[in-house]
């Protein structure tokens, strides 16, 4: 009995000891000054404890191992924390005010009266916030490399630090190798911590102020208000401007510092809730600790929780990722030795892509290789991460990809005559189709069953739902349609009720309502099949789908169908034969386009033009056809494609989609449910898009 009581007592003590620890947030700090501030916070708020490490990398390792839970990092370190070997993610962003701005400006600052500009920095002395940091290293050095001021062939040639050492006469870049030219101007141990007096924004400015350096790469707020008149910004065009002109004279806008932690939603919520509940302690002040920007930047005004799907790549954006990659590039090689990694969605597309790869082999190499993903959105993520390079997508997906910093580079052309003499931009008509004699019109759709190509796609969702939203001003489309199939919808949604899956005896339900070709009602042909098989009353598709799938042109399930058995629903409430699409349609919309990262545009265009000459509609090699699909319809490209045409360099996704489409999307985006988690993550910052 005594033994049982003792065991019970020990169990209670263990529980009592573990409970507070479970709720405690272990904050990682990098200096004695930060440790003092953290201890003061922990004394006020018992839910915090402090873990001391030597630097950001050591903190990242400690968080991965569970020794610590969180730290605030700048963009360069957020990139490192998100790499596969660490697997951390940003969970909370600093907000610097000015209408909730989670971005800041990276600038180059010099003393007033010194006679040089950004284009004449060679041989000058430089002050950096730290090696690998956003404003202090990645942005300025990336810009100098991109502009060919710093000549660097790649890491196979030599480290970028070596090229920077040759460019500047001397520097202080905390975190560089002690004894190197990059540490020559430093005042302390050149460590990436407050042990080095010239570390971080305040330190880099002090390096400039003390006369150690000629230029400091910092943020504008690092220059004290009382001293602004003595300093100037160096603009990228070679001119100078006042410190307060940073909005027009800067190197880049970069994502705010963010709190990173392990990929654990419960832990992320706990950290955020504990931080916002802090009272009687100023998280955003470092007064009294003999340093600045401790734990958080002093310029932060509040904290903003990030969408749960946000990872470091989505947080930083394609443009900033491109800058970081430019500093980690391998030695450049000719385009002829490169292969572009095409992203295929689902097994059927992967099969066609593999065939494309095999047929593209020449001289021991192929110009195309294949990656696969379960959805287009996952492909967009892969392209952002450089795990894939390109994919052809619908206009709605061009919109999402554009929000994520990717660019449209080639467009499908459906008119063979325009392949040799292009006129206006390639386009198609979004139409509403019903069975002839159904009595259905555009005005009587409410309460009916709907067939969509996919959630967020142009003809199948964005255009019809955008029009319906303009009429009803109601974002709950389940009140409008009784049920339907819109692949990509939440499982259990009325818009999954009519989906079919793959039809396979095993695993068929796994594909049900998924936005991939295994779902038999996915895509243009799938939405039409949904109508044909009486799973829906109306199909929202492209104008060519009915003739392509009927009168003996379609697959087995459509072999007995006649195009005359179907009709178009016009917006004025009338109906028309399917041949009258130019008069009876919901919208004229841009064709599907190939998207990629900004820095791979040239390679993707040149290789696709080369492959098109070989495997296009009138290509020289008939062993493979890029624009034909044998197993299923519209794999990799739409089967109606006659050629791919280059989109003029510099064309923004907004210009490609056109004013009408953008207006429709902006209307639809008033409905938060119509915005994907990916798009929400990509549009969290105002600075993720290229200016």
UniProtKB/Swiss-Prot annotation:
Disulfide bonds join 28-50, 127-207, 172-186, 235-249, 343-379, 353-370, 404-682, 419-643, 451-530, 475-671, 485-499, 496-513, 570-584. One of its GO terms (molecular function) is metal ion binding. GO terms for biological process: antibacterial humoral response; iron ion transport. Residues 25-329, 340-670 form the Transferrin-like domain. GO terms for cellular component: early endosome; extracellular space; plasma membrane; recycling endosome. It comes from the Eukaryota. The keyword Disulfide bond applies. SMART domains: TR_FER. Transmembrane segments: none annotated. The keyword Cell membrane does not apply. Glycans are attached at residue 169. Abundant in liver and serum with smaller amounts found in the stomach and kidney. Coiled coil: none annotated. Keywords: Disulfide bond, Glycoprotein, Ion transport, Iron, Iron transport, Metal-binding, Repeat, Secreted, Signal, Transport. It is found in: Secreted. SUPFAM superfamilies: Periplasmic binding protein-like II (SSF53850). Hydrogencarbonate 1 binds at residues 129, 134, 136-137. Fe(3+) 1 binds at residues 74, 104, 201, 257. PROSITE patterns: TRANSFERRIN_LIKE_1 (PS00205), TRANSFERRIN_LIKE_2 (PS00206), TRANSFERRIN_LIKE_3 (PS00207), TRANSFERRIN_LIKE_4 (PS51408). Belongs to the transferrin family. This is Serotransferrin-2. It comes from Salmo salar (Atlantic salmon).
């Amino acid at each position: 009995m005594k033994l049982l009581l003792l065991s019970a007592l020990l169990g209670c003590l263990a529980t009592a000891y573990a409970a507070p620890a479970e709720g405690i947030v272990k904050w990682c700090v990098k200096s004695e000054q930060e440790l003092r501030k953290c201890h003061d916070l922990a004394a006020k708020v018992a839910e915090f404890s402090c873990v001391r490490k030597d630097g950001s990398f050591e903190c990242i390792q400690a968080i991965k191992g569970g020794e610590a839970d969180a730290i605030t990092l700048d963009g360069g370190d957020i990139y490192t924390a998100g790499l596969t070997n660490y697997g951390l993610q940003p969970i909370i962003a600093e907000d610097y005010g000015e209408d909730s701005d989670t971005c800041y400006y990276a600038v180059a600052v010099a003393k007033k009266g010194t006679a040089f500009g950004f284009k004449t920095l060679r041989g000058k002395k430089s002050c950096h916030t730290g090696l690998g940091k956003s404003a202090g290293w990645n942005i300025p050095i990336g810009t100098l490399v991109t502009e060919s001021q710093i000549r660097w062939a790649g890491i196979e040639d030599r480290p970028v630090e070596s090229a920077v050492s040759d460019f500047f006469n001397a520097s202080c870049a905390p975190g560089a190798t002690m004894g190197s030219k990059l540490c020559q101007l430093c005042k302390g141990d050149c460590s990436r911590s407050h042990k080095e007096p010239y570390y971080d924004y305040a330190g880099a400015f002090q390096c400039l102020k003390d006369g150690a350096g000629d230029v400091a790469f910092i943020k504008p707020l690092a220059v004290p208000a009382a001293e602004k008149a003595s300093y100037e910004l160096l603009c990228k065009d070679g001119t100078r401007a006042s410190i307060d002109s940073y909005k027009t004279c800067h190197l880049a806008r970069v994502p705010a510092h963010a709190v990173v932690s392990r990929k654990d939603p419960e832990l992320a919520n706990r950290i955020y809730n504990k931080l916002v509940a802090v009272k009687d302690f100023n998280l955003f002040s470092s007064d009294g600790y003999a340093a600045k920007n401790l734990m958080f930047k002093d310029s932060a005004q509040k904290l903003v929780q990030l969408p749960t799907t946000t990872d470091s790549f989505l947080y930083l954006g394609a443009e900033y990722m491109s800058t970081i990659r430019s500093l980690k590039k391998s030695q450049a090689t000719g385009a002829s030795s490169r292969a572009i990694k095409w992203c295929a969605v689902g097994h059927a597309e992967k099969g066609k892509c593999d065939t494309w790869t095999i047929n593209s082999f020449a001289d021991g190499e192929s110009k195309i290789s294949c990656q696969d993903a379960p959805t287009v959105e996952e492909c967009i993520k892969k392209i952002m991460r450089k795990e894939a390079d390109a994919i052809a997508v619908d206009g709605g997906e061009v919109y999402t990809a554009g929000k994520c910093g990717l660019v449209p580079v080639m467009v499908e052309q459906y008119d063979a005559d325009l392949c040799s003499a292009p006129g206006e931009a390639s386009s198609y008509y979004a139409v509403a189709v019903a069975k002839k004699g159904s009595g259905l019109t555009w005005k009587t759709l409410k309460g009916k069953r709907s067939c969509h190509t996919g959630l967020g796609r142009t003809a199948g969702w964005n255009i019809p739902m955008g029009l319906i939203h303009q009429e009803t001003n109601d974002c709950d489309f389940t009140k409008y349609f009784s049920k339907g199939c819109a692949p990509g919808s939440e499982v259990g949604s009325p818009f999954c009720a009519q989906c079919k899956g793959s039809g396979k005896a095993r695993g068929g339900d796994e594909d049900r309502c998924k936005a991939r070709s295994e779902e038999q009602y996915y895509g243009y042909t799938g939405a039409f099949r949904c109508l044909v098989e009486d799973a829906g009353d109306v199909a929202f598709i492209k104008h060519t789908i009915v003739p392509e799938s009927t009168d003996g042109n379609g697959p087995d399930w459509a072999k007995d169908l006649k195009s005359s058995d179907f009709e178009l629903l016009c917006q004025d409430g009338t109906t028309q034969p399917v041949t009258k699409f130019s008069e009876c349609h919901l919208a004229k919309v841009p064709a599907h386009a190939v998207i990629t990262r900004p820095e791979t545009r040239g390679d993707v265009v040149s290789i696709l033009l080369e492959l098109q000459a070989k495997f296009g509609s009138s290509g020289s090699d008939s062993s493979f056809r890029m624009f034909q699909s044998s197993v299923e319809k519209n794999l990799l490209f739409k089967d109606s494609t006659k050629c791919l045409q280059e989109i003029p360099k510099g064309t923004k996704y907004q210009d490609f989609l056109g004013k009408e489409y953008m207006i429709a999307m902006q209307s639809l985006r008033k409905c938060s449910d119509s915005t994907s988690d990916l798009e929400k993550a990509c549009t969290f910052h105002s600075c993720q898009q290229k200016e």
